[in-house]
Amino acid sequence: MKKVSWIVVIAGAVVGLAALVLTHLGNPANMGFCIACFLRDITGAVGMHGAAKVQYVRPEIIGLVLGAFIMSVATKEFRAKAGSSPATRFVLGAFVMIGALAFLGCPLRMVLRIGGGDLNAVVGLVGFTLGIFIGIQFLKRGFSLKRAYPVGKGEGGVLPIVMTGLLILVIAVPSLFKFSEEGPGSKHAPMLAALLIAVVVGALAQRARLCMVGGIRDAMLFKDFKLLYGFVAIFVVVLAGNLITGSFKLGFALQPIAHSSQLWNLLGMVLVGWGSVLLGGCPLRQLILAGEGNGDSAVTVFGMIVGAAFAHNFGLAGNADAMNEAKEVVVGGISNNGKVAVCLGILIMLGVSLWNMPKTASAPVEAAK
């Protein structure tokens, strides 16, 4: 195995271990890390949505961005660039978030859920892989959001600066923010521990180019399995940890913060996989890229934040399975509004894919960021 593969394996193992530790310290079950859920919680904390159960300034998001920033500066890999179809990326980011919240998790949480025995997430993985496969068909035919261009360092540092400001405010003036008193938002690891763990994870993810989409995409497109090792390492560590601690629960019904409406688990992750291929990386990768100076990825993250606000203000997000008073399982899922949003998102992915195809002869596949 090449050296770079070991870097990816180590990074994946650390991510899996970090997720287990954060869950032990107070984060929700099977949610040691979740980019979609944590961005959604921050969105609620700053008042952009009113869902009282999912409001908290998650230091994990701040730490991931700052860890990537610190590592990229230390290794002289910080490159300020932007201008690659930012408006399109904003829209794609919003719909990737809507798809993730329909499923109740980003690709990273999908792996954590599978490691905890949640078979609904296996259905999500099928949809995720299908979405990646569809996106690859357009990459093969020359899909491109065009190149980014060098910009000033201030432009490249927008998201690290925003996250630093958010951290200062939540420490100095916590009364500015909304915090959940019950539900997933009320369950969290101590702020300092979560921040430090996330900084380490962010730094390693930057160094290893860790990406949940990239592993499957590269395996399909180039027969290159290096990034896939990270995906597998996360799963193996989380599975082992859950088996050791007795937290492993195999099945579909009543999994932590999950629903067993399988069609929408599948389609939600089709939307996430397809959109992430078009964007050049999963939600985790977008945070890391923004931390190392990519202004287009910062725009994508802002799009995801707006998508989270829309998802909860308009009732688009999934609802978990529950037990009623008669001890019967009530299957969750998404509302009619959410179903329309997911289907609309898939149509928008198709439109963006077709619109950004070369108008003449086929072009080479755009390299992943």
What kind of region is each of these model predictions?
Residues M1-K369:
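Membrane-interfacial helix-loop segments of redox and metal-homeostasis proteins
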